C-alpha cells in the first residue's frame, strides 16, 4: 500500500484577515487611498504612518478616500509628546465628525487618550483610566461604531461605551494633527490599521 503524506500549510495573516472581513487601510509603504487636508506633513516610515505639524505649527488631517457608516477599526498608535492628535471616524468635515482622542491629559484636566470627542459637543465620553494608556510606547486601539452605539477599547480595556446620534455616517476614517506652538516637535505614529465593515 502506497503511503500518502499530507502537508498542512498555515493560513497567512493576509488570508485570515480577508476571511474574517478585515481589510488593511494602507499598504505599509505608501499613502495610496488617502487624501490630505491642511498643511501637516505625512509620510510612511518603517511601516507606520507618521504625522508632523506643517510650517509654523500648522494642523492637518489624513483621511481615507472610502467612507463607512458602521464598522470596527483596529490600529496601534504611539505619540512623541507633547501632542494632540486623534483618530477621526464618520468624518465628513472638521465640523462633522467623531474622534477617538490622543492627547496630553495636562491640557484637558486629566482627560486621557481614548476619550470620545464629537465636533460641536466637545467630549461625549471621557477616559480617565490611566492604566489604559502606555505613554512611552505603542497602544492598541479598537473603535466600533454601530448605529448610535460607539465603543472604544484601548490596550484591552473598554474605555468608552456610549450612545450618540449626532453623526450617523457614512464618513471617512482618518488621523488628525492639532495646530499650535505648544505641540512643537509632536509626532503621531499609526500602524497595523485595518477595518471591518458592519453594514
Name these PLM-found stretches:
Residues 1-13:
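N-terminal secretory signal peptides and thylakoid transit peptides that target proteins
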Amino acid at each position: 500500500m502506497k503511503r500518502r503524506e499530507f502537508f498542512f500549510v498555515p493560513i497567512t495573516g493576509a488570508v485570515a484577515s480577508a476571511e474574517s472581513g478585515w481589510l488593511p487601510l494602507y499598504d505599509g509603504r505608501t499613502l495610496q487611498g488617502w487624501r490630505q487636508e491642511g498643511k501637516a506633513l505625512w509620510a510612511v516610515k518603517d511601516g507606520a504612518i507618521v504625522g508632523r505639524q506643517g510650517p509654523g505649527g500648522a494642523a492637518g488631517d489624513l483621511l481615507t478616500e472610502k467612507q463607512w457608516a458602521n464598522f470596527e477599526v483596529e490600529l496601534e498608535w504611539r505619540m512623541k509628546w507633547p501632542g494632540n492628535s486623534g483618530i477621526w471616524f464618520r468624518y465628513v468635515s472638521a465640523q462633522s465628525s467623531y474622534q477617538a482622542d490622543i492627547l496630553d491629559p495636562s491640557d484637558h484636566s486629566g482627560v486621557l487618550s481614548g476619550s470620545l470627542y464629537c465636533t460641536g459637543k466637545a467630549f461625549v465620553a471621557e477616559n480617565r483610566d490611566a492604566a489604559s494608556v502606555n505613554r512611552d510606547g505603542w497602544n492598541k486601539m479598537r473603535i466600533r461604531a454601530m448605529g448610535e452605539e460607539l465603543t472604544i477599547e484601548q490596550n484591552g480595556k473598554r474605555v468608552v461605551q456610549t450612545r450618540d446620534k449626532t453623526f450617523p455616517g457614512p464618513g471617512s476614517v482618518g488621523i488628525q494633527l492639532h495646530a499650535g506652538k505648544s505641540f512643537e516637535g509632536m509626532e503621531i505614529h499609526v500602524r497595523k490599521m485595518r477595518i471591518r465593515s458592519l453594514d
